[in-house]
């Protein structure tokens, strides 16, 4: 698949960097990122998820019979941290849990995944999410924030984690935790020369001053339109592209995930469309989170954005073929196998 400059990023492992696997490089937009000591710090939510499988999502006032239920770790932040670690990044997760059994289980999950856990303990209970998953892979989610809403606990843990951050490190956050905690972490990251990545989900208004703290913005189609102030009664391709250009003028680098249509990347005044991998979705719950975690893992490894986005798309394609949230994130060898098995171009 050609990049905006015409060079290919598919076909061999060479696009993943030098033989050491962790080179550094000067990205024309993001500056110097990647290297042997580069780490990923993910700030965000951690939930105990209860997922229910069903033929379709019920309408208001409707009762339907489920076909199964399961519980496991989730939350956008935790999902992204696990995805980054499984993709090969040295990863730290910053968040908050309650002083309860669910919080201890989430701490154990992070340890098992090799993720350093900066978990503040809140007086509030651990966050909980209830996920409805239809047979076609679509989902509807209700979240009880709990400890994820404890901005003071999260900010304290972030300050500790960021104390050793430096140039080349990446800090990834979402908006399932208090905005003040995210902005505080990004200010500290920028002061230390780290690269900031914001997955603006769930969507909320952000000022120009707030977006100035963001180096890379990741949104889906609806979030793109909403954040740009465009009408959201539909996701026509032209409207999304126009909204993405408006955001790129405020941020610089914007990645819009388009579901089965791939991703749109706007950077350095150029737009690049990256196709998706055609797969049959089983559960799309953690697709976006897996994309974000995999993307920052490759930026940390030294890949340019033009290579990191296809890698993230491959990771998301594997993710949606499995059930669950954090548990559905693929590992590096699986992603590489998919990339090497698909000799296609755009």
State what each model feature region is.
Residues 10, 15-16, 20-21, 25-38, ...:
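Conserved phosphate-binding/catalytic region of the ribokinase-like
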Residues 109-123:
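A glycine-rich helix N-cap at a beta->alpha junction
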Residues 114, 149-156, 196-203, 275-276:
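Short gly/ser/thr-rich secondary-structure transition/capping motifs
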Residues 161-165, 210, 247:
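Structural alpha-helical scaffold elements that stabilize or flank donor/cofactor-binding regions
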